[in-house]
Amino acid sequence: TDSELRGLTFWTMGSFGGASWYLILPAIIVITLSMLWMIPSSRKLDLLQLGEPEAYRLGVDVKRLKYKVIISSAITVGVSVSLSGMIGFVGLVVPHLVRLLGGVNHSYLLPGSALLGAGLMMSADLISRTLIQPAELPVGLITSAIGAPFFLWLIFRIRKI
């Protein structure tokens, strides 16, 4: 039907229009458990930034840590995308922004990225719902409009072009 097609279109561009506590509560539980599972690995992730051989020499089981990160990320992303659709640039921009604000320590980077990402998404959703009332823009359009220029700035800043 027409409403199902509209819903699918909004899902592919990212939308919180169909959000309900019935769907969100299990997602909050799963994402919180995934974060709580990763935070104790913050120090190991910090050591991994030195390189795999160095982290291994410092006692990190690199292979196990990689599996843990991949599993946690896959669970978190899978739950998030299944509810809100594909929303671009948040996962790319937010961790870099947190690094700029608070450094590279993963004990701050992991929860900081979650909190700043949530704040960015709430702001983008507010903009998407109020910009052209009574219509609603897909939130993915707003995050792309904010994220793409920021990501380009980051690339140019790193390469000093």
Question: Where in this protein do the model-derived segments appear?
Answer:
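Alpha-helical transmembrane segments in inner-membrane proteins
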Residues: 1-161
